[in-house]
Amino acid sequence: MFDVRVINKRENKNWSLKKICYQLFLATLCPFLLSCNNDQETKHIKPEYWSTSWATSLKVATPGFDPPVPKIKNTTIRQTIKLSGGGEEIRVWFSNEFGTVPLKVAGATVSRGLGRGSIEKASLRKLFFEKKGSATVLPGERIASDPLKFPVQNLSELVISIYLPGDLSGSSSPISYHVRGLQTNYLAPGKQVESADLKNAVTSVSYFFLAALDVKSQDKRPVIAAVGDSIMDGDQVADAEPVDENARFNNFLADIIFKNG
């Protein structure tokens, strides 16, 4: 039997978040109008702009508070992200900002997902870094993949797979991650970035070393950054956490903005 009190509490919280999102949407109308006026003056030039469509904050694990970080040694990590705005090209940012040793990325791909860690193989594209298939992220740094022509729609989902050959769990270097991702992501042994289905994978609701994704389009968009506590991640009461539901504050806000033109 469902716990009605929990459901009502969750619905009330979601309704409050939606009210806040509508207020923020009204506040963004002015920048959108100014942007439209500027575009009218130079519409014959058809410029293109990069803007961040997805991003998350990273941290290191807090002993005794955060759950243990999964073992990462010779590991493929497959992570699903929910975009806000779409575009014709993408670039993906990877981070080693809290690490104390270089992070070797020995393969990375982007694709559309089919759920439960599976991907649409026909959509898979390799990511390159200065035209190379691998890269090293220095301690305290971030790197972006080369721009890739990969059209994406507003509010769509993408799957990013990376292969990390090193023994990160066996080193003393902190792992840069976002603990409360509330998205089922997958860690599998060996190099499986191009596999449609992962073998022997374990799951986590965290994001690892993945910092942001930018899109390139002809729209000059303002970017809104949501800063706050775990409510921004979509945290609810423990027995009703919305994993894989995209029920974060910024998801509600993006829905309102893009569905209202």
Predicted regions and their residues:
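Signal peptide-proximal N-terminal region
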Residues: F252-G261
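Bacterial N-terminal signal peptides that target proteins for export
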Residues: V4-L24
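Bacterial N-terminal signal peptides
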Residues: Q23-F32
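N-terminal secretory targeting modules
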Residues: L29, C36-V227, M232-P242, N246, ...
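Intrinsically disordered, low-complexity serine/threonine-rich segments
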Residues: R5, K19, S35-E41
